[in-house]
Amino acid sequence: MVGEHGSLAGRTVLDVGAGPAQFAEAFRAAGARYVAVDADPAGLTTRPAVAARGERLPVADRSVDVCFSSNVVEHVPAPWRFADELVRVTRPGGLVVVAYTNWLSPWGGHETSPWHYLGGYPAAERYGRRYGHPPKNRYGAGLWPVSVAAGLRWARGRPDAELLDARPRYLPAYARGLLRVRGLREVATWNLWLVLRRR
């Protein structure tokens, strides 16, 4: 989906929150120079890689062609500060791609779903009772509620980037219209896909 907005050949892609670098092969196959960034150095399985938090990237301003982050925004307490960092390190004309699972989607509570609809803390407590241990993605400690509306506001309000694409990531492209319907978009989107071009 990133390649829909231009060739990746010869481009430097920074994958922020890369974890096990599940997208490395696809980016490299498209000709990109791939660099993984993750807060957990033990999880960095590819090279080159940088151990760093996404909210404070040790990367120069305007230095990468594509800054990509998949399913990380909901795991940081200040999601839009995190997203601001992605814009900061992207060159003018480069792409910023942010995709995340929104809280009110069926999988917003991750492994505690669908009980997160009753609240993050009660869902985590229920999970603990059922499985005998807390969820990996604990509400308020490693999982925060992020909305589609907040992501669209952030993307549309940037003076230093133009929003090129916003759509439900796992639905057909024609489902973009869901994003115009408040309320419904929060439940039906599942995962919001945002692509911005740095000015």
Predicted regions and their residues:
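Conserved SAM-binding loop
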Residues: 2-108, 194-198
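S-adenosyl-L-methionine-dependent methyltransferase catalytic module, highlighting the catalytic core
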Residues: 77-85, 91, 95-195
